[in-house]
UniProtKB/Swiss-Prot annotation:
<comment type="similarity">
    <text>Belongs to the bacterial ribosomal protein bL33 family.</text>
</comment>
<dbReference type="InterPro" id="IPR001705">
    <property type="entry name" value="Ribosomal_bL33"/>
</dbReference>
<dbReference type="GO" id="GO:0003735">
    <property type="term" value="F:structural constituent of ribosome"/>
</dbReference>
<keyword id="KW-0687">Ribonucleoprotein</keyword>
<dbReference type="Pfam" id="PF00471">
    <property type="entry name" value="Ribosomal_L33"/>
</dbReference>
<dbReference type="GO" id="GO:0006412">
    <property type="term" value="P:translation"/>
</dbReference>
<protein>
    <recommendedName>
        <fullName>Large ribosomal subunit protein bL33</fullName>
    </recommendedName>
</protein>
<dbReference type="GO" id="GO:0022625">
    <property type="term" value="C:cytosolic large ribosomal subunit"/>
</dbReference>
<dbReference type="InterPro" id="IPR011332">
    <property type="entry name" value="Ribosomal_zn-bd"/>
</dbReference>
<dbReference type="InterPro" id="IPR038584">
    <property type="entry name" value="Ribosomal_bL33_sf"/>
</dbReference>
<dbReference type="InterPro" id="IPR018264">
    <property type="entry name" value="Ribosomal_bL33_CS"/>
</dbReference>
<keyword id="KW-0689">Ribosomal protein</keyword>
């Protein structure tokens, strides 16, 4: 069986609220760390989310 190309990652809020999203990314084409602007419901604003490991 072949190794899967997509991996699950955790997007952690940079606002320090502890909120996170779980998403997938293609590890072969996106080798750098992912940063996305998404909505944080704790602070009720759009903030930057940075990639972290799923524990």
């Amino acid at each position: 069986m072949a190794k899967p190309t997509t991996i699950k990652i955790r997007l952690n809020s940079t606002a320090g609220t502890g909120h996170f999203y779980v998403t997938k990314k293609n590890a072969r084409t996106m080798t750098e760390k992912m940063t996305v602007n998404k909505y944080d419901p704790v602070v009720r604003k759009h903030v930057e989310y940075k990639e972290g490991k799923i524990k």
